[in-house]
Structure formats: C-alpha cells, structure tokens
Amino acid sequence: MKKIIALSGSGNSGKTSTLCIVHKGLLSMAESIMDEHRIDDGDQRNILVINGVNVGIETQGDPNSRLSSSLILFKEHNCHLIICATRTRGSTVEIVYNLAPEYHISWRGQSSLSEASLRDESNQAIANLIINEAKSELNV
C-alpha cells in the first residue's frame, strides 16, 4: 500500500530543518531525481527514485503553502511514498487526510524546543526515525 509519512508540528518548530535532514539522507540513496524545486528559505520539493520507487518529499507544510499542489503532483507521478510537513491541525492536516484511503498515513510529531542544541539533537533523532521508516518501506 502507498504511504504518507507526515511530520506535524506547530509553526517554527523545526519541521523544515528535520525534513531537510531526511531529504539529504534519502538523496544519497536516490538513483535519480524526477522533479526538483527549491526556494531561498530552504524549503524543497523533490521526487526521488529510490530502489525503483518514486518518493515525493515536500518540506513546506504551512497553511497557504504549496503542500496541496505538491501532493497532487506526487500522486500524478505515482509516488508510493510521500514525506511531508503539516501543522498540528487545520487545512494542512485535511490536505493529507484527503489522500486516504489510497495512502496509509503515518503521523510523526515535531517537538518545539527553545534551546538550539536540544532542538538540533531532536531534529536529527526525528529525521533518523523517518529515514529508517522510509528505508523499511523501500526495502533498502
């Protein structure tokens, strides 16, 4: 079954930073990149091919962001795994729920920590969890 790993968290909690770590980890395993879109603030959208499987990654998860159009793009490109950011409630969560039941949704939470060193450690730990879940899903 197709799967979405959705990282939810409040605004400015580090979701983009965490998913950029995930992106870097998965990029090292990618056979090719089908779609790449970066913007100056660090957000990225990619479709990677890993072990013959299309994987969509969207780091923008704020309301009124490109999340909806990215998920449509990922679905059109038959991505079997989608990794994205959302807020904890509201429109971004609904956008992800709209892809069920075609996609199983695996929710992961982003902690909000004020101390930079703890935040970096937490982001890395959450990224590792998501990377390992993706590897398991992709059989790599």
Segments predicted by a language model, with ranges:
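Short, Lys/Arg-enriched charge-dense amphipathic segments
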Residues: 5, 28, 55-65, 105-114, ...
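Active-site catalytic pocket residues across diverse enzymes, especially alpha/beta-hydrolases
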Residues: 26, 30, 100
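Glycine-rich phosphate-binding P-loop
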Residues: 3-26
